[in-house]
C-alpha cells in the first residue's frame, strides 16, 4: 500500500480503537461477508453499527480527497471491516471456511455447483443487457415484473450464472398457492 492507503487504514483502525498490527496479523483470516457469529451481545452490535457509520463517513471523505485505484478498499465495505475488526478487538478468532465460499454473478453457469452460495455481486451496469443486474432493482421488484411478464428476463445469456437467480424467482411465482382454510 502507498502512503495514502496507509493513512486510510490508520484512520479506520482509529475508529474501531484497534491496533493496526492486529489487522495485519489477521489479514489471512478476513474474507467476504458470509458469517456465522457466536458469543456477541447487543452492545457489540451497537458498537459495530456506530463504528461502521463513522468509518463510512471517514472513508468517503478520504476517497474524495485521494481517489483510490480500482481494487482498493471501497467505502461500501465499512460495515464489513467494522464487524471483523471489532471481533478481533474482543479476541474472537475468525476463519475462512469453504462452506461459506461463493460464486459471483459474473461467473459462467458451469461454476454454479462448485460452491454453496451464489453471491449476486460483480455484475456492473455495462453487463446489464446480458446478465441480471441487481442495481436496476433498487426501486423495482423483479418478482413483480416476472409476474406481469414471465419472459421479462429472456435477454439474459443462457451461460450466465445469473440465469439461476432468475430461475429461482420464476419458481417462486409459479408455485401453487395453498389454501389452508
Listing of model-derived features with the role each one plays in the protein:
Residues 1-181:
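Glycosyltransferase catalytic domains, chiefly GT-A lineage
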